[in-house]
Amino acid sequence: METVTETGTGAETQIGNPMREVKLAKVIVHINVGKSGEMLEKARRVLNEITGQKPCTKQAKRTLKEFGIREGEPIACLSTLRGERANQFLKRGLEAVSNSLKRSSFDENGNFAFGIKEHIEIPGTKYVPELGIFGMDVMGTLERRGYRIKRRRIRPSRIGKAHRVTQEDAVKFMTGTFGVQVKEA
């Protein structure tokens, strides 16, 4: 939203609708280890150090005999970041991938995702030999004001088509706010 000041009067007029502003709703950082036990605990410690908050564990949805995974066994951990913490982590995470994303990383609903092969690529992260190196997925969700109506408890409703965040809106937000270069896949 632009703010224009008229010369001499000191009055400010706003251009643009504040309801149309796109904002970062949340960032999810996810590490999938594929097995429970010591490796999962190490991944939790790494995620705790990187995000600054305690991660939760996720269980396997079904049994996969080829990989030795049983249904209900904890195999992954994730942290959901919101607000300023999400903005700060996303800036650091994008530096790990050279501030560039593919257009295919954005979906039609204003979400984006990218992978980081080694957590030590994130600026400010040090290698700890006892923990090892983990890769992670970073997923972001973009929203506009008014998206609460689909999550509220009483009389939830749908977001209208004109108000939804599209792929183009998401690309424009990421290039403008975070300086991301979007490559055509």
Model-derived segments and their meaning:
Residues 1-185:
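Ribosome-associated RNA-binding proteins
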